[in-house]
Every structure is written in structure tokens, then in C-alpha cells.
């Protein structure tokens, strides 16, 4: 079994040095590794995180932007909310 602990980057491929683990971002470039067996808790955490998203509509509902930018990593099932009019882009 993979050791799904520690810090990670959502840009790492595979995240957490194993395809059995997932990286949950807590900031745009950093996060923590988890074992995806607890998917309901992961889904809840994504729902509650103000910037994690799976769609533009989700960003609008959360009030954290109007564009869900997907991570360029096929191991990541979500993206980060941005305001498309933002200077940050």
C-alpha cells in the first residue's frame, strides 16, 4: 500500500509519488497527500474549500471567482477558482 502522507504539489505527476494517492490543494501550489478511499470526506472538503472547483458555476456559487482553472495534471479531479477579470491571471 502506498504511503499517502505529507506535502505535495498539485502539479506533481503522479501526485504524492504514487498513483494510489491524491493531492488535495490548500493553496494554489501546495497541498497534502491523502488516500482516496475516504472519497466522501474528500468531496465534502472540496465543497467547503472556497477555491477548489469542478466547474465555473461552482466558483460563482462559492463567490470566489467566475472561472474554474483546471490543474494541468490528469490525476487532479478539480481546479482553482479565479476571477477572469482578475489581475492575478
Curated annotation (Swiss-Prot):
Keywords: Disulfide bond, Knottin, Seed storage protein, Signal, Storage protein, Toxin. Disulfide bonds join 4-21, 8-23, 16-33. The C-terminal glycine may be removed from A1b. Residues 39-46 form a propeptide. Residues 1 form the signal peptide. One of its GO terms (molecular function) is toxin activity. It comes from the Eukaryota. SUPFAM superfamilies: omega toxin-like (SSF57059). The presence of a 'disulfide through disulfide knot' structurally defines this protein as a knottin. A1b binds to basic 7S globulin (BG) and stimulates its phosphorylation activity. This is Albumin-1. It comes from Vigna radiata var. radiata.
Amino acid at each position: 500500500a502506498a504511503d499517502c502522507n505529507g506535502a505535495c504539489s498539485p502539479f506533481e505527476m503522479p501526485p504524492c509519488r504514487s498513483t494510489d494517492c491524491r493531492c488535495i490543494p490548500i493553496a494554489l501550489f501546495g497541498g497534502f497527500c491523502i488516500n482516496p478511499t475516504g472519497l466522501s470526506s474528500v468531496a465534502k472538503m472540496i465543497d467547503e474549500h472556497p477555491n477548489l472547483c469542478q466547474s465555473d458555476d461552482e466558483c460563482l456559487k462559492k463567490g470566489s471567482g467566475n472561472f474554474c482553472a483546471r490543474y494541468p495534471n490528469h490525476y487532479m479531479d478539480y481546479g482553482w477558482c479565479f476571477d477572469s477579470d482578475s489581475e492575478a491571471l
